[in-house]
Every structure is written in C-alpha cells, then in structure tokens.
Amino acid sequence: MNSSLQRLEKKIGYQFKDESFLKLALTHRSANGTHNERLEFLGDSILSFVVADDLYHRFPKVDEGDMSRMRATLVRGHTLAELGREFQLGDYLYLGPGELKSGGFRRDSILADAVEAIIGAIYLDSDTETVRGIILSWYNTRLESIEPGVSQKDPKTRLQEYLQGRRKPLPTYTVTKIKGEAHNQEFTIECIVAGLDKPVIGKGSSRRKAEQSAADIALGQLN
C-alpha cells in the first residue's frame, strides 16, 4: 500500500487487508470508472444500526422519539463531514477535474459520503464486530456528550420556541454580505431578536449555516 493511504489508515484506526476497498471508498463518481456510491449505501445502513444499538443500551429509559433525534444528530451529513475533516479526508479523495476545480474535496456532502463509504469498505474487508468497534471509536466523544431532549433541536428551532414561549415576535434573518467565489462562499447574516439591544451577526459557508450560527449566538445572549 502506498504511504499516503497508510497515513489515512492510521487516522481512521484500521489497516485494510485489501487496499482496493479503501481506494474505491475514496473514489467520487466524478472520477472515471467505478465509484463509491454502493459502498456509501452499505456504510449508511451499518452506521445507522451501530449508532441505534449503542443509544438503545446507553439510554435504557429514553423513548423512541428522543433516540431517533439523537441518532439523526449523530449520523447527519454535517457530523459525518466533521469526521471527514478530522481524518483530513479531502487530501485522499479521487475526484474528477471539475470537482477538483470547484473545491469538491472541501464539500460537506462529498466528505460525508466518503466516510459512509469507508465504513462499508471496512465491513467488507473485515466483519461486523470490527466495523462496530471502529465506528464507536470514531464516535466515542460524541456519544459520551450527547443527551436526550432539547439539545437535539437545531439553534433556529430552539430560538423560535424560546421566543414563542414568551409570546415574543419571531426573529428576522437578513443576508448582509456574501464573500468569495461560488464554490467557496462565506455568508454574513444579521439576526434581529426581541429582547436583545443589538442585532446578532452569524457567519457560515451557506445561508442556512450562517442563520444557525446567529441563532446559536442569540440563544447564548438570552440565557
């Protein structure tokens, strides 16, 4: 195996017996030939099961609704993309020229899909218990810190519920600035919230993320 992939193996905590599984997991459909989408499908199902099983045993008194919300938080694309960045996965992806040029190695969806594909690849290269152990090692900190209840709602939802519960008007979000090229933009949002003297400013790589950032800051100031 080449030294580059060996470095990645150390980061993910698994050494492949068959290098071709890892290479396939890192190959986006924009690259010519076979790509990682079948592995992604497999990995998505495995991840969902492993996380659901852990939550079931970790929280014996929590109902189905809260467990579903916790699982959704843990397996959503944003969380998977965070894992991908922790592994510096963008440095190892095989992308077509168009995706390379547009910064695909930084895109949340591509990183998240590759993480799921790696899970599928590890399963095919090993067995159920091995892939379970790898997933739980990746998620250890997140599983230790997650709690049932309101924390699983996103900041915009929590801010809205906070204001509604106090019979206050809903916040308004306005884009005040968009910086950068189309594939690598930064949005600045101004959020006006009843009860706060000044508008709250949030920034993010999309309008939605900037709004969530502003809502999170507003909640911190209100509480």
Swiss-Prot record:
The active site is at 44, 116. It is found in: Cytoplasm. The keyword tRNA processing applies. SUPFAM superfamilies: dsRNA-binding domain-like, RNase III domain-like. Mg(2+) binds at residues 40, 113, 116. Gene3D superfamilies: 3.30.160.20, Ribonuclease III domain (1.10.1520.10). This is Ribonuclease 3. The gene is rnc.
